Every structure is written in structure tokens, then in C-alpha cells.
A protein has these predicted regions:
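A small-molecule sensor/coupling module
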Residues: 1-16, 97-101
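Amphipathic, well-packed alpha-helical segments that form the structural scaffold of globular domains
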Residues: 16-24
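Phosphate-/nucleic-acid-contacting segments
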Residues: 25-101
């Protein structure tokens, strides 16, 4: 599988797509439209996954936190509002994602 979104998108697009993927593949439901990622991930881990710097990954995660899309603590427990995250995926924020199998 090739993810063109991670090659050409903005930093926010890369992070949103990665969070959505992690929520679906490694998440567990903790409430209505709330998913907890069951991996122990740091800002550096997100940077490595997306090809961003640690600082950029942290900045983008904080933006999503202020938009109430994601909550997390310094103990790296990530909970996502799946409805908001999916809306961002379907919105104009991520217009150039292509997945080729």
C-alpha cells in the first residue's frame, strides 16, 4: 500500500490521517465517538510516523487538542473524537489523499 497523503500533504493533513489510521487499527472505544489509541506514543513517535519534526508534530497535536479533536496527557494517553476527526478527513483539509493498493 502506498500513502501519497504522507508524501505531499501539509503537516496537519499528515497528522490527521495518521491519527485516523491509528484509531481504526489500534484504538478501542471508550465512549460515544471516543476512541483511545492503545499505543504508547510520544511526539517524537508521531514525528517519525509522519516525517515531521518533533516540534511540528507537537504543534499540530496541540492545535487538534485546542479544537477538542484529541485529548492527551504527558503520559501519552491519546483519546480521539472520531466524529470530528472523520469530518476533518472528509472536509477540504485533506483533499489530496490517495491510497494505491
Amino acid at each position: 500500500m502506498r500513502l501519497n497523503a504522507l508524501q505531499h500533504s501539509r503537516a496537519s493533513d499528515k497528522l490527521i490521517y495518521t491519527l485516523h489510521y491509528l484509531a481504526l487499527s489500534h484504538g478501542r472505544s471508550v465512549g460515544p465517538q471516543r476512541i483511545e489509541i492503545t499505543l504508547d506514543l510520544t511526539h517524537q513517535d508521531f514525528a517519525n510516523l509522519t516525517g515531521l519534526t518533533r516540534e511540528t508534530a507537537a504543534t499540530e497535536l496541540n492545535k487538534l487538542k485546542h479544537q477538542d479533536v484529541i485529548t492527551y496527557s504527558k503520559h501519552t494517553l491519546y483519546q480521539l473524537d472520531l466524529a470530528k476527526l472523520t469530518a476533518m478527513l472528509n472536509d477540504q483539509y485533506i483533499s489530496d489523499i490517495q491510497i494505491k493498493l
